[in-house]
Amino acid sequence: MFKGSNVALITPFKNNELDVEAYIKLIHFQISNGTNGLVPAGTTGESPTLSHDEHQKVIDLCVKESNGKNIVIAGTGSNSTKEAISLTTHAEKAGADAALIVTPYYNKPTQEGLYQHYKAINDKCGIPIIIYNIPGRSVIDMSVDTMARLFELKNIVGVKDATGDLDRVNQQKDKMGTDFVQLTGNDDNALEFNNRGGVGSISVTANIAPKLCSDFQKASKIENNESKLEAIRLDKILQPIHSSMFIESNPSPVKYAAKLLGLCDDEVRLPLVKVTDPTKDIVKEALVSANLL
């Protein structure tokens, strides 16, 4: 279930309000282009600037519009355990298939604090939980040992690994086995991540290149030479897009790309701002190189 290409959905805005029409359009664009899973209200969805009502609404819309065609992995993380429980409980009631829960940011818990945070959510909720380990944003790195302890709990099923450290894939596989789901949060390392035992990605690029990302993920997990060569070919096409998505703060570049494709406006909420003209040129060039524009 939790494998292949899963999109870290952007949240479209119009005049600083949620653009429901554009959001529904984005969801169906993903459904029709082979995306396995939809991930609303994550980092790329600008969750830090969504109100609680908006956070719940984007999850509700995602579940409703996907209508069982795609899995929904709802972003429900917070640096407040109480709030994370509340958001996860809502996602469960809404019908989400799983929750993506980021390691608590800013308050810098110990490894025991991380364990107790996820255990408390696990004990109060009944849907699968995917740990989101992103030390670059959370300023805390969950250790493999802590992850292994959490995997013993009933609802913890895997990790979105955004450490950028490919050795972690091997370490986590050795410690937890192949039943522990490993999804990369770094588009640029997806090929090697899967080669080492990962099973997919939660992708920024998939917002604008869903079919390419889906085809790449499928090819990368088929054990024959022809498929491996196809995965390498698709990865080479995707790499310029991956690079262009992170020249400036995510999700500003991907929102500009989505605007070029007519999917939604490029509006972001402060403190994020729209991309500069030099970045626009690079994003546009990357889309053209992949025949997306």
Swiss-Prot record:
Broad class of the protein's primary localization: cytoplasm
SUPFAM superfamilies: Aldolase
Active site: 132, 160
Metabolic or biological pathway, per its Swiss-Prot or TrEMBL entry: Amino-acid biosynthesis; L-lysine biosynthesis via DAP pathway; (S)-tetrahydrodipicolinate from L-aspartate: step 3/4
PROSITE patterns, alphabetized: DHDPS_1, DHDPS_2
Residues holding pyruvate: 44, 202
SMART domains per UniProt: DHDPS
Keywords recorded for this protein, A-Z: Amino-acid biosynthesis, Cytoplasm, Diaminopimelate biosynthesis, Lyase, Lysine biosynthesis, Schiff base
One MF term in the entry's GO annotations: 4-hydroxy-tetrahydrodipicolinate synthase activity
Known partners and oligomeric status: Homotetramer; dimer of dimers.
HAMAP family per record: DapA (MF_00418)
Protein's name according to its UniProt entry: 4-hydroxy-tetrahydrodipicolinate synthase
Organism (species): Pelagibacter ubique (strain HTCC1062)
Designated gene of the protein: dapA
